[in-house]
Amino acid sequence: MGLLAVLLALSAVVAGVLSGVLGRAAFEEGSAARRALTVDGTAGAEIVTRRAADPAVQDETVRRIIGSCFGDVPVEATRDVVADPAVIAGASEAEPFARWVIRPEPARITAEHLDPLARGATALRQQLRSSEVGVRGVQVLGDLEKTATAAARNLAVARALSWIPSGLLAIVAALAVSRVTRLLAITRETETLQLLGRGATGGQVLFANLVEAGVVALVGSLAGSGLAWAVLTLFGGVPVAPVLAGGAATLVLVLGCVALAGIGRLRGPGRDETSRLRAGRLRTAVAATSLALIAGGAGLASAQLLRVGSTIRWDRESPVPDWLATAAPALLLLLAALVAVALLGPLARLAEAVLLRGRGLTGALAAAQVARNLGAFAVAAVATVLAVGTTLLAAGYDGTAPPLQQRLRNLTAGAPVVADLREADAEVGRSASQPSTPVWRYPEASIGPVKLTAIAADIPGLAAVSGQNLPEGLGTQPPGQRLPVAITPRLAEETGLAMGDEFQIQLFSRHLLAVVAANVEAVPGTTRSNALLADAGSLRRALESRGAELPAPSQLWLSPAGEDPREAADRLRGMPGVSAVTVTPTEAAPDDPSRLVASRFRSAALGSVVLAVLGIGAVAFTQAGMRRGQVAVLHALGADAGSQVRGRVLELLGVVVFAAAFGAGASWLLCRALMAGLASGVVAPGTVSLPVEPRIEPAWPGALLAVFAFLIAATTWALGRVIRGQIRDGHFREETP
């Protein structure tokens, strides 16, 4: 019954972890979709046209088109009549306009609705233009198409990147189940020998084990998945499918591992010494070959990730996982776990030899037991390496990718507050009463066939409001009325320009002679990789030399000092000449892919720690049952309870501490080498490449590892209680086959 209880707990925990992670991912995606559509009020589309002679037929036609465009997507369409020119230009009491407002129903929207919603908004515009709905024209206004398209793209990126933590968790779960079931099979070897000795065939024993394991695994999977579903329901509910998928995967995994472990143990009994030696050499060869294959796969995957610089590729504007690069973190951590197991035996024997020279025997005996029971202690070592490694890798992603996304947001906006200007008005800048600078944007600039975005401003003022270090000297006009500019590395690569090169640039409808005066990592106000920065004064003089004038600035950038940016934005909105004001968000958007993927990493880290505690507990208590006779013998030889408990705890803690240190070191190296590629998956193609500085988030990983350490301490305490109970039991009799 004890072994069945371990198998039941294993099935329940694995099912709970997998169902919880999959269900939480589905819940977060649905929540992100709903919040993305309602972050600034519910996104919607407006159909505006003059009211037809027969309004009922017109309304029926519009609703039929809406239904054909959006299909099963839950949207609500309302109609009203507008006769106020302040609402719609041209409307009047004599000739009112009909308006249909289409909004998604947030309570029913799921992540799967975003793509059809975006396509429907695009199709709506096309179908209305070719229909007879409009009376002297029809307009489709609103931000539904733009918002839904951006949200669908962000969630697609998050899903493509989520295969990284999903792969880590899959490796952890598979190894935990396979190692623990193998340990259980070893524990039941005596019982297997008894059944074979009484005439049972190997097939009958295997079938009985599978039936027994199937019933236990089914009960455990249902219990674990049910508990996960109940917990997730408290936070708002999730679809049943992901939860059931976690339970089904657990059942298949447990049965498969039980079958493999059973077949392996059935081949062992009844063989002579020569066969056993041959089998041992074969296992060693298989282990070495597996290690070499995994090392080769990890090397290829890492090389692919370093070569392409990301774990996703773009196929027609759609993110697709690069499966080889995506597998790199999981394969490297798996390799680290296997290397740790390979080192565990030699290090244990070395520790035994060193400790034998000391006075006490407890440490030496503990090291000897680890060296002699590597099959059991390998479970604890692998589980600990993967748990600590996954947690620190998740901490590295959490500390690197979201800050990179925030830097891109800041770079796109340019400044904390950006006002779009309809016309030049010096009063706007003076009334802002904040550090501000006018900015000229020209996204249609070109150098020969190469298209680019040009930004011009007073460079010191731009540096002050954007917070970026910008090159000096762009305001100094070189001889010959050449325009000094700073270019991005990508633009330099595409045009072949280097420092001091002169070239012709099409800028503000004029061809100007420019010179590369500096290189700049990125240009404030755009994330485009092809970008150029110029000083507004130098640009004005260059245009005047060609008989042209610098047009009015397109934007005013502000960096409020001692004032909330939203208050500064509200004040700007009422000023003449201002068409729109944008405040750069300081928090991640609801559909920010880096935030969603970081959450997946945290779930994988939590799941790996739970599975590690289960694996270590299984090692401790199955070993306690298998070595009960050893406890009685040592007690008869004079070993007191305290020394035996200390020795057994030292065995377990020695393995766990070694594996934790090894996993932490491997994960740190992985973060330093590959985190730039993992974090860069959130960067869209054509976006400027910013340097990535890997940083490990310390808060939640520290708390999680502290809980892990506490649970290991509790396990050792419980193990000590079990051993003391065995010593007090005076009726123990070793069973013999």
Q: What do the PLM-derived regions correspond to, one by one?
A:
Residues 459-468, 492-529:
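Mid-to-C-terminal secondary-structure elements
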Residues 1, 175-214, 614-657, 731:
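Interfacial "coupling" helices/loops that link adjacent transmembrane helices in transporter permeases
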Residues 1-174, 183-186, 310-326, 339, ...:
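Membrane transport/envelope proteins' first extracytoplasmic loop
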